[in-house]
Amino acid sequence: VLTAEDKKLIQQTWGKLGGAEEEIGAEALWRMFHAYPPTKTYFPHFDLSQGSDQIRGHGKKVVAALGNAIKNLDNLSQALSELSNLHAYNLRVDPVNFKFLSQCLQVTLATRLGKEYSPEVHSAVDKFMSAVAAVLAEKYR
Protein backbone atom coordinates (compact mmCIF):
# COMPACT_ATOMS: atom_id res chain seq x y z
CA VAL A 1 0.00 0.00 0.00
CA LEU A 2 1.33 3.39 -0.97
CA THR A 3 1.59 5.84 1.90
CA ALA A 4 1.03 9.57 1.51
CA GLU A 5 4.82 10.01 1.64
CA ASP A 6 5.30 7.36 -1.08
CA LYS A 7 2.81 9.15 -3.31
CA LYS A 8 4.55 12.47 -2.76
CA LEU A 9 7.97 10.98 -3.58
CA ILE A 10 6.63 9.28 -6.72
CA GLN A 11 5.06 12.50 -7.99
CA GLN A 12 8.20 14.52 -7.20
CA THR A 13 10.45 11.97 -8.89
CA TRP A 14 8.26 11.85 -11.98
CA GLY A 15 8.40 15.63 -12.13
CA LYS A 16 12.21 15.48 -12.30
CA LEU A 17 12.16 13.59 -15.59
CA GLY A 18 11.78 16.93 -17.35
CA GLY A 19 10.84 15.91 -20.86
CA ALA A 20 13.10 12.85 -20.97
CA GLU A 21 10.19 10.43 -20.61
CA GLU A 22 10.55 8.95 -24.11
CA GLU A 23 14.27 8.34 -23.61
CA ILE A 24 13.69 6.81 -20.18
CA GLY A 25 10.99 4.50 -21.51
CA ALA A 26 13.16 3.46 -24.45
CA GLU A 27 16.16 2.82 -22.21
CA ALA A 28 14.09 0.74 -19.77
CA LEU A 29 12.72 -1.38 -22.63
CA TRP A 30 16.16 -1.81 -24.17
CA ARG A 31 17.52 -2.92 -20.78
CA MET A 32 14.64 -5.38 -20.40
CA PHE A 33 15.22 -6.91 -23.85
CA HIS A 34 18.89 -7.46 -22.98
CA ALA A 35 18.53 -8.55 -19.36
CA TYR A 36 15.53 -10.78 -20.13
CA PRO A 37 15.84 -11.91 -23.78
CA PRO A 38 12.59 -13.97 -23.78
CA THR A 39 10.69 -10.65 -23.52
CA LYS A 40 11.67 -10.00 -27.14
CA THR A 41 9.13 -12.63 -28.27
CA TYR A 42 6.31 -10.13 -27.75
CA PHE A 43 7.92 -7.72 -30.22
CA PRO A 44 8.81 -9.78 -33.31
CA HIS A 45 8.05 -6.85 -35.62
CA PHE A 46 10.28 -4.36 -33.75
CA ASP A 47 13.77 -3.22 -34.58
CA LEU A 48 15.21 -3.99 -31.14
CA SER A 49 18.42 -2.03 -31.58
CA GLN A 50 19.10 0.67 -29.02
CA GLY A 51 17.31 3.90 -29.86
CA SER A 52 15.20 2.44 -32.68
CA ASP A 53 12.01 4.29 -33.57
CA GLN A 54 9.90 1.33 -32.42
CA ILE A 55 11.57 1.08 -29.02
CA ARG A 56 11.34 4.85 -28.57
CA GLY A 57 7.67 4.85 -29.58
CA HIS A 58 6.74 2.01 -27.27
CA GLY A 59 8.85 3.48 -24.47
CA LYS A 60 6.89 6.70 -24.81
CA LYS A 61 3.61 4.75 -24.50
CA VAL A 62 4.85 2.89 -21.42
CA VAL A 63 5.93 6.07 -19.67
CA ALA A 64 2.70 7.86 -20.65
CA ALA A 65 0.69 5.01 -19.09
CA LEU A 66 2.79 5.24 -15.92
CA GLY A 67 2.30 9.01 -15.89
CA ASN A 68 -1.45 8.48 -16.10
CA ALA A 69 -1.24 6.00 -13.23
CA ILE A 70 0.71 8.54 -11.16
CA LYS A 71 -2.08 11.07 -11.72
CA ASN A 72 -4.51 8.44 -10.42
CA LEU A 73 -2.58 6.87 -7.55
CA ASP A 74 -5.75 6.44 -5.53
CA ASN A 75 -7.46 4.48 -8.31
CA LEU A 76 -4.86 2.50 -10.24
CA SER A 77 -7.35 -0.20 -11.27
CA GLN A 78 -9.49 2.28 -13.15
CA ALA A 79 -6.51 4.18 -14.58
CA LEU A 80 -4.95 1.00 -15.97
CA SER A 81 -8.10 -0.97 -16.84
CA GLU A 82 -7.80 -0.67 -20.63
CA LEU A 83 -4.11 -1.51 -20.51
CA SER A 84 -4.83 -4.52 -18.31
CA ASN A 85 -7.45 -5.77 -20.78
CA LEU A 86 -5.09 -5.28 -23.72
CA HIS A 87 -2.23 -7.19 -22.12
CA ALA A 88 -4.39 -9.99 -20.71
CA TYR A 89 -6.86 -10.65 -23.52
CA ASN A 90 -5.27 -9.40 -26.74
CA LEU A 91 -1.51 -9.56 -26.27
CA ARG A 92 -1.49 -12.34 -23.65
CA VAL A 93 1.68 -11.09 -22.05
CA ASP A 94 2.98 -13.29 -19.23
CA PRO A 95 2.56 -11.15 -16.07
CA VAL A 96 6.13 -11.88 -14.94
CA ASN A 97 7.24 -9.48 -17.69
CA PHE A 98 5.70 -6.55 -15.81
CA LYS A 99 8.15 -7.24 -12.98
CA PHE A 100 11.04 -7.39 -15.44
CA LEU A 101 10.07 -4.01 -16.87
CA SER A 102 9.71 -2.63 -13.35
CA GLN A 103 13.26 -3.66 -12.48
CA CYS A 104 14.67 -2.19 -15.67
CA LEU A 105 12.76 1.07 -15.23
CA GLN A 106 14.10 1.39 -11.69
CA VAL A 107 17.68 0.85 -12.88
CA THR A 108 17.11 3.47 -15.58
CA LEU A 109 15.73 5.98 -13.07
CA ALA A 110 18.60 5.30 -10.67
CA THR A 111 21.24 5.84 -13.35
CA ARG A 112 19.60 9.05 -14.55
CA LEU A 113 18.73 10.58 -11.19
CA GLY A 114 21.87 9.54 -9.31
CA LYS A 115 21.82 10.63 -5.66
CA GLU A 116 18.27 11.95 -6.07
CA TYR A 117 17.18 8.32 -6.39
CA SER A 118 17.48 7.84 -2.64
CA PRO A 119 16.58 4.65 -0.76
CA GLU A 120 13.25 6.27 0.14
CA VAL A 121 12.51 7.10 -3.51
CA HIS A 122 13.59 3.61 -4.56
CA SER A 123 11.21 2.08 -2.02
CA ALA A 124 8.30 4.28 -3.15
CA VAL A 125 8.91 3.61 -6.85
CA ASP A 126 9.26 -0.12 -6.18
CA LYS A 127 5.93 -0.16 -4.31
CA PHE A 128 4.30 1.83 -7.11
CA MET A 129 5.62 -0.44 -9.85
CA SER A 130 4.56 -3.52 -7.85
CA ALA A 131 1.06 -2.05 -7.57
CA VAL A 132 1.02 -1.34 -11.32
CA ALA A 133 2.16 -4.92 -12.07
CA ALA A 134 -0.55 -6.29 -9.77
CA VAL A 135 -3.25 -4.24 -11.48
CA LEU A 136 -2.04 -5.26 -14.94
CA ALA A 137 -2.15 -8.92 -13.84
CA GLU A 138 -5.66 -8.69 -12.30
CA LYS A 139 -7.45 -9.76 -15.47
CA TYR A 140 -5.41 -12.97 -15.70
CA ARG A 141 -7.34 -14.59 -12.86
From Swiss-Prot:
Keywords: Heme, Iron, Metal-binding, Oxygen transport, Transport
Domain Globin: 1-141
Domain of life: Eukaryota
Organs and tissues of expression: Red blood cells.
SUPFAM superfamilies found in the cross-reference section: Globin-like
GO MF terms held by the record: haptoglobin binding; heme binding; iron ion binding; organic acid binding; oxygen binding; oxygen carrier activity; peroxidase activity
Gene Ontology biological process terms from the UniProt entry: hydrogen peroxide catabolic process
Binding site for heme b: 58, 87
UniProt function note: Involved in oxygen transport from the lung to the various peripheral tissues.
PANTHER family: HEMOGLOBIN FAMILY MEMBER, HEMOGLOBIN SUBUNIT ZETA
Family listed: Belongs to the globin family.
Protein name (Swiss-Prot/TrEMBL): Hemoglobin subunit alpha-D
